[in-house]
Amino acid sequence: MSMYYLMAQLPSLDGIGENAPPPITEERFHELCHCFLGKKAQRNLDRLTLAPPRDFEKSGSSLINAWNTAERDLRLALGKMRAEQMQKNFDAGDAAFPVGILQAARTAVEMENPMEAEKFLNHYRLEFLETLRPMDMFSEDSVFYYGLKLKLILRASRFDTSAGKAAYRNIYSSILNGDRLEVLS
């Protein structure tokens, strides 16, 4: 019953434009969730991330596991393709990437404008997340879906062209100098 109360209090994230602010803050979302979720679900919620490590711990949620696997694979594919483009080595492990992830990574790497590449990747991530959307709107996985979507929307709302150029130059220099700042932890 508590899941009904929680989901009924969350504003819809559907149809939010690229530059529109989200209708709820991440802090408020977490406050509401901590009132209604059990301890295990709260732990899973607190571990939601847009940047999972290479060797992430499996959660009790198939949605979180699918998200972490796909996001890790996307980041590794991007790293590998960017390194190949600059004729550098990149250890992507023994990963065999799904075709959709390879196509998205290739498209992003081929884009000349880093901001457009980030917008493309964010759109790709939102589309992928939509494929994971649970049928049951009142399940824990629906809360995790909402949390990940909110994180992606918040991330997109923070895109800043000048800061992006500075970060791009920093990562590019890191690759050329072998500092490996671009590598997943």
What are these model-predicted stretches?
Residues 1-185:
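Extended alpha-helical surfaces
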